[in-house]
């Protein structure tokens, strides 16, 4: 029986962040009501200053830090785009 007070999510890392985090993807279980911001804090994901890292939640780029995570959510941390 699944824990009804928790959500299981998958995180995906791209670019240099994949090297910093030491993995391409991580699956985690968090307390119900956890947000994207909570996830960043818990795993110390480097988002300081103008890192340019964008967050996609379930395929939607630009997820706010106060977005409440749902069971089965997929959160991707995308490197800045470079034009040319």
Task: Label each residue range with its predicted role.
Residues 1-83:
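Ubiquitin-like/PB1-type beta-grasp interaction modules and other compact soluble beta-rich domains
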């Amino acid at each position: 029986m699944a824990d009804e007070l928790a959500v299981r999510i998958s995180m995906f890392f791209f670019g240099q962040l994949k090297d910093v985090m030491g993995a391409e993807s991580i699956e985690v279980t968090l307390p119900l009501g956890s947000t994207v911001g909570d996830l960043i804090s818990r795993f110390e994901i480097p988002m300081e200053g103008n890192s340019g890292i964008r967050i996609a939640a379930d395929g939607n780029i630009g997820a706010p830090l106060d977005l409440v995570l749902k069971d089965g959510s997929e959160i991707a941390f995308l490197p800045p785009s470079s034009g040319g």
